[in-house]
């Protein structure tokens, strides 16, 4: 912290973001140290942390990026603040990722350990048919197709360095405009799903 603050920070943990008991801290350090390392015993579990500064100020945190075999760019959207209300999105409620298809059993179990109930698939029909589909009765899989052009060709062009950085910027800018203008019905359906509390926790994924 800057300026340096006196006192201690205590860290408590739980696999539930809503219930983190404060009876026994897993770590204590001076606030002035600025950092600490916590090693978890079970990597298949998702842990949330409550940091208590000088037994007064409290903040919940968790890792943003989550490493799940077979799923790229899996992230927790918790902690982001709403510009309109100033409130923060709850941890462990909404995740986003790249495509989720024929993932190994260990990855399915990790999603279940996180309590995932609903998987919202935003891929087009063509994108979905190019990959094996995820079939698991424990997840409510909802398909809301949103076309974003030939994403596979774009990604391949980036990997082969055939598409320049300024071109990527223009493509993304154009894509974002098209999403807002052309897919209002699809986004309405998406937010209708998100308004139902029984669907949570939710993963939203694209290609």
Regions found by a protein language model. Give the residues of each.
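Cys-dependent protein tyrosine phosphatase-like superfamily
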Residues: 1-203
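Extracytoplasmic, non-cytosolic globular domains
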Residues: 205-207
């Amino acid at each position: 912290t800057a300026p340096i603050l006196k006192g201690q920070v205590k860290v408590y943990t739980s696999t539930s973001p809503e219930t983190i008991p404060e009876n026994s801290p897993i770590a204590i350090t001076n606030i002035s140290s600025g950092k600490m390392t916590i090693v978890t015993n079970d990597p298949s579990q998702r842990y949330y942390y409550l940091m208590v500064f000088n037994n007064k100020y409290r903040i919940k945190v968790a890792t943003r990026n989550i490493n799940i075999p077979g799923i790229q760019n899996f992230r927790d959207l918790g902690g982001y603040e709403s510009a309109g209300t100033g409130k923060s999105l709850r941890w462990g409620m909404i995740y986003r990722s790249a495509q989720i298809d024929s993932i190994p059993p260990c990855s399915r179990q990790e999603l279940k350990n996180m309590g995932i109930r609903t998987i919202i698939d935003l891929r087009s029909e063509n994108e979905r048919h190019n990959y094996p589909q995820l079939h698991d009765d424990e997840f409510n899989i909802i398909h809301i197709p949103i076309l974003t052009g030939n994403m596979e060709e774009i990604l391949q062009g980036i990997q082969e360095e055939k598409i320049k950085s300024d071109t990527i910027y223009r493509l993304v800018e154009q894509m974002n405009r098209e999403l807002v203008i052309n897919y209002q019905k699809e986004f309405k359906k998406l937010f209708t799903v998100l308004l139902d509390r029984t669907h949570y926790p939710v993963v939203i994924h694209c290609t």
